[in-house]
From Swiss-Prot:
It comes from Pan troglodytes. It holds the Pfam family Glycolytic. It catalyses: beta-D-fructose 1,6-bisphosphate = D-glyceraldehyde 3-phosphate + dihydroxyacetone phosphate. The record marks 364 as: Necessary for preference for fructose 1,6-bisphosphate over fructose 1-phosphate. It is an enzyme of class 4 (lyase). The lineage of its organism: Eukaryota, Metazoa, Chordata, Craniata, Vertebrata. There is a cross-link at residue 42 (Glycyl lysine isopeptide (Lys-Gly) (interchain with G-Cter in SUMO2)). The gene is ALDOA. GO terms for cellular component: cytosol; I band; M band. GO terms for molecular function: fructose-bisphosphate aldolase activity. Homotetramer. Interacts with SNX9 and WAS. Interacts with FBP2; the interaction blocks FBP2 inhibition by physiological concentrations of AMP and reduces inhibition by Ca(2+). Its EC number is 4.1.2.13. Belongs to the class I fructose-bisphosphate aldolase family. This is Fructose-bisphosphate aldolase A. Catalyzes the reversible conversion of beta-D-fructose 1,6-bisphosphate (FBP) into two triose phosphate and plays a key role in glycolysis and gluconeogenesis. In addition, may also function as scaffolding protein. It is found in: Cytoplasm, Myofibril, Sarcomere, I band; Cytoplasm, Myofibril, Sarcomere, M line.
Length: 364
């Protein structure tokens, strides 16, 4: 076995570990506001609003300037490249706004999925070229963590061994480059909820994918204490006719994680994967109440499940700003409780909060 050549100094390791711990402190989680220009277009279109740079800026500002009740709930905020360089009405750059509320700035660094030729519609993720230079610049511009999304699909013959291995290696290479630049990498191997598979099949695939990811991270000498994982919860496929309880989903999810994710990993920040806002909170709560030993923080990194009601309430109208922020605060508070296993659904969730946010073959 070759000798280990140290990739990071003790100081670098401490910085990475400290950032990761801040993001997943008890009761805290991440707002994923890193939709690409194409993805945010779909959100704005759903409320009849034009996809202009100013509308995108105003909407992100609405989320970032919500009142101080969100401060103990949302610490990490993942931004898209454009948003990192936008400013609030008062002239402050968005990273400054986030930091003034005690938050940590994150940046989406992947460049989207591309087809893996010779597979049944499977993909890998591009964006490694020039990543080191971009990370160095992002660090200077105030970002302390990053996100990279890979996508896998459950089908009769998918995910293939090739897709699993390729995506695991891409995530590991990305993680290595981030850590060299003082940025905490969030690895996101998303298994899409598309399909009619049951809970057991999703659990099996999730275990195989995560095992491959952590083997690759080990091969690439990643410092696990300075990383976070952003996985899907283990849920049945969207077209599965059998219904499963929140407790069954929690047990399957925690079991899969316990079998594959080393305890050295600081935290697990779940994606919401098209669940309704309310469902995402209830399942997160059930996961935290699951009666198995859980060595990592288990919290949220939600996009649609923090924003859907707020987006509807805003409706593209400036005069609805406060109403929209109120909806966002509600979801932030709900998820802050859920990641501590303390959330009790009131049964009064608005229509928007109970609405499925599933999008077939979701591109980000």
């Amino acid at each position: 076995m070759p000798y280990q050549y140290p990739a990071l100094t003790p100081e670098q390791k401490k910085e990475l570990s400290d950032i990761a711990h801040r993001i997943v402190a008890p009761g805290k989680g991440i707002l994923a506001a890193d939709e690409s220009t194409g993805s945010i277009a779909k959100r704005l279109q759903s409320i009849g609003t034009e996809n202009t740079e100013e509308n995108r800026r105003f909407y992100r500002q609405l989320l970032l300037t919500a009142d101080d009740r969100v401060n103990p709930c949302i610490v990490g905020v993942i931004l898209f490249h454009e948003t990192l360089y936008q400013k609030a009405d008062d002239g402050r750059p968005f990273p400054q706004v986030i930091k003034s509320k005690g938050g940590v700035v994150g940046i989406k660094v992947d460049k989207g999925v591309v087809p893996l030729a010779g597979t049944n519609g499977e993909t890998t993720t591009q964006g490694l070229d020039g990543l080191s230079e971009r990370c160095a610049q992002y660090k200077k511009d105030g970002a302390d963590f990053a996100k990279w999304r890979c996508v896998l699909k459950i089908g009769e013959h998918t995910p293939s061994a090739l897709a699993i291995m390729e995506n695991a290696n891409v995530l590991a290479r990305y993680a290595s480059i981030c850590q060299q630049n003082g940025i905490v990498p969030i690895a996101e191997p998303e298994i899409l909820p598309d399909g009619d598979h049951d809970l057991k099949r999703c659990q099996y695939v999730t275990e195989k994918v995560l095992a491959a990811v952590y083997k690759a991270l080990s091969d690439h000498h990643i410092y696990l204490e300075g990383t976070l994982l952003k996985p899907n919860m283990v849920t049945p496929g969207h077209a599965c006719t059998q219904k499963f309880s929140h407790e069954e989903i929690a047990m399957a999810t925690v079991t899969a994680l316990r079998r594959t994710v080393p305890p050295a990993v600081t935290g697990i920040t779940f994606l919401s994967g098209g669940q309704s806002e309310e469902e995402a909170s209830i399942n997160l709560n059930a996961i935290n109440k699951c009666p198995l030993l859980k060595p990592w923080a288990l919290t949220f990194s939600y996009g649609r499940a923090l924003q859907a009601s707020a987006l509807k309430a805003w409706g593209g109208k400036k005069e609805n700003l406060k109403a929209a922020q109120e909806e966002y605060v509600k979801r932030a508070l709900a998820n802050s409780l859920a990641c501590q296993g303390k959330y009790t659904p009131s049964g009064q969730a608005g229509a928007a909060a109970s609405e499925s946010l599933f999008v077939s073959n979701h591109a980000y």
